[in-house]
């Protein structure tokens, strides 16, 4: 890894001398500068229009969020777009999240009136509970249909969320077949797709949508860390250093175990990134 020779501080660039040590630089010099970060390609605007057009035909909405960043991975526009519809939040990737924090978030979302399901879409855990959870969420509506003689009426659920949160993978697991295209990168799903789960349940897979501007730069960083934003619009080294700083502060033991490195007091994110790179043979 090549050490950067300049650092942007308050609109100016400071040259780093060959003998300077990063830890001795002012704190603001080491700060990640991603103010104004956004990624909102044209297809996301089309997706918002499609959601608005289709929502009236839906019985319920399932919002997939990343269990590692539950609040940051919730698009603030979704509440308005889906107003009035029964809602379920699926906390995906719980296998990669802090279990204690996941429980707190699940309880918080339930307190807000959402049905909540914890899942690991890639491994399949939790996905087998989805169909029953949807029917429980809609039990009053289904009972009303039954009274009108509409037994067996198809339930239609819109599945939405930010890019690369695992929507298509989740749908494929629920449907028990690979119907929706899924890859570990944002922006793969570009159009809506209906996926039947059983004789009376259909899911509408939708492209991931962000919002035009992140007012909170911390939210932007978290979305970048978890792959919701395309790498080619990011400064990957800056973000990696910031993430290492965060992990050292909150999950030092996990960092040590994952990369088999020493995490010492005073280590900067750059130091830790360099240690990890050397440990894995990427640096000489």
Q: Model features per residue range: what roles?
A:
Residues 1-9:
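Short Lys/Arg-rich cationic patches that frequently serve as NLS/NoLS or arginine-rich RNA/DNA-binding motifs
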Residues 2, 13-60, 68-77, 81-87, ...:
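Helix-rich effector regions associated with P-loop NTPase G domains
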Residues 66, 109, 170, 205-206:
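Residue-level signature of catalytic and energy-coupling elements of molecular machines
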Residues 121, 171, 201-204:
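Conserved active-site beta-strand-loop modules that form the wall/rim of enzyme catalytic pockets
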Residues 152-154, 177, 192:
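Short coil/loop residues immediately preceding or within conserved phosphate-binding loops
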Residues 157-176, 206:
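Glycine-rich phosphate-binding P-loop
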């Amino acid at each position: 890894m090549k050490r950067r020779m300049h650092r942007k501080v308050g609109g100016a660039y400071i040259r780093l001398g060959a003998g300077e040590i990063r830890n001795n630089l002012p704190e603001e010099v080491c700060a990640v500068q991603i103010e104004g970060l956004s990624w909102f390609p044209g297809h996301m605007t089309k997706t918002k229009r499609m959601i608005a057009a289709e929502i009236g035909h839906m019985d319920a909405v399932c919002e997939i969020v990343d269990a590692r960043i539950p609040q940051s991975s919730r698009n603030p526009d979704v509440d308005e777009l889906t107003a009035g519809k029964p809602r379920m939040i699926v906390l995906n990737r719980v296998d990669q999240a802090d279990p204690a924090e996941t429980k707190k978030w699940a309880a918080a979302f339930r307190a807000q009136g959402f049905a909540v399901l914890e899942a690991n879409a890639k491994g399949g855990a939790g996905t087998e509970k989805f169909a029953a959870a949807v029917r429980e969420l809609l039990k009053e509506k289904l009972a009303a249909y039954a009274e009108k003689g509409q037994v067996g009426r198809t339930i239609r659920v819109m599945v939405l969320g930010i890019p690369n949160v695992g929507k298509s993978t989740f749908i494929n697991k629920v449907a028990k077949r690979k119907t929706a295209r899924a890859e570990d990168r944002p922006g793969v799903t570009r159009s809506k797709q209906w996926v039947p789960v059983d004789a009376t349940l259909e899911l509408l897979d939708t492209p991931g949508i962000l919002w035009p501007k992140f007012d909170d730069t911390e939210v932007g960083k978290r979305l970048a860390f978890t792959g919701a934003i395309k790498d080619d619009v990011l400064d990957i080294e800056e973000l990696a250093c910031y993430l290492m700083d965060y992990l050292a502060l909150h999950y030092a033991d996990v960092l040590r175990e994952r990369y088999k490195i020493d995490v010492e007091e005073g280590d900067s994110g750059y130091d830790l990134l360099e240690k990890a790179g050397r440990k894995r043979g990427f640096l000489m």
